[in-house]
Amino acid sequence: MLVLDSSALFSMEQLPEEESCCPPGVIRELTKYKDHRLDLWGDLLRVSDCTGESMDKVTEAAKKSGDLGRLSPVDMTVLALAIDVNGTVLTDDYSIQNVARIMGIPCRAVG
């Protein structure tokens, strides 16, 4: 399962063939910028909330790594959702990649 952040979705013309999901905040960010690809991807992209327990783990790891101030709340939910679904994060955000690496969450760079 791929867990996509906003940067991954903004950079794609089509979704990966692998099953993909994202937190609701990512959808809100794309909607804010009137990205019409959501109209095409709506049925293919699973939208899921993360658990509070996973958010706590991400917050603690981000504090330890020094990335807490660089991660948006949506970034943190991407990482937490990856924990919940045992997924691989797809992003170009260095802070997300750094916290994912520290936490042992698989991560792939966009592009």
Q: PLM ranges: what are they?
A:
Residues 1-87, 94-107:
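Active-site-proximal, substrate-binding regions of enzyme catalytic domains
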Residues 111:
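Cys/His-rich short segments
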